[in-house]
Amino acid sequence: MPKIKWTNKDFKVFTIDGLEQRMDALNLHVRPKFNQLGEDFSAFFSSQLGEEFFPHVAKHARRTVNPPKDSWVAFAPYKRGYKSLPHFQIGLWHTHLFIVLAIIYEAPQKNVMAERLLAHKSLIEQLPDDFIVSGDHMSPEAVSLEVAKEDKLKEMLIRLRDVKKGEFLIGRHIPKEQATKLTASELHQLTEDTFNSLLPIYNIIVGK
């Protein structure tokens, strides 16, 4: 039975001033939910993709001054980390919930991954129109897939391939006003539906 529901208090964590104060609130309100989602969806990915996936809850351990503007749990088939691999994420900015598949700049094979995506761009374009794409995991901004189909999607994938800092994220952004109204069951279903739509894209990325 799904247990996790997002509240306004969860989103307000990212408006609290001060590193220590925000981290305390994050640890109290948000991280336990990421831990539970980590358990639930690592089992989902392991089952769906046929290899063991591990959850990685963001620790923000390197921060000494600036409080985190977002936080997340990531999923990858590697116990010691996820940033060098294509990975799935569930996370929050103060404005929205994000449910995405990500390739970030630390992935050493991202040029190969980008070529695979370019070769199957039509499959990406068949995803639901309420999906978004982004070229920067450090920014809350994104472009709707419906708009990106024109030329932005190709531009992003070429940048992913050719530019060292190029990144690619795809999935859903759910405004906090909508996310906080979802029941635990509705939220779980939406998250699972989003990831199910992204599984074929993940398989393309990893060459399956």
What is the meaning of each model-derived region?
Residues P68-D70, P128, K165:
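Sequence-level motif detector for i,i+2 pairs with an aromatic at +2
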Residues F98-L101, A179-T180:
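Short small-residue beta-strand/loop micro-motif enriched in glycine and branched aliphatics
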Residues L101-L153:
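Compact, glycine/acidic-enriched structural inserts
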Residues M1-F98:
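Charge-rich, low-complexity N-terminal segments
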Residues D40-V57, Q126-P140, I204-K208:
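Short glycine-rich, low-complexity/disordered patches
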Residues M1-S46, A142-K208:
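Long, solvent-exposed, polar/charged low-complexity segments
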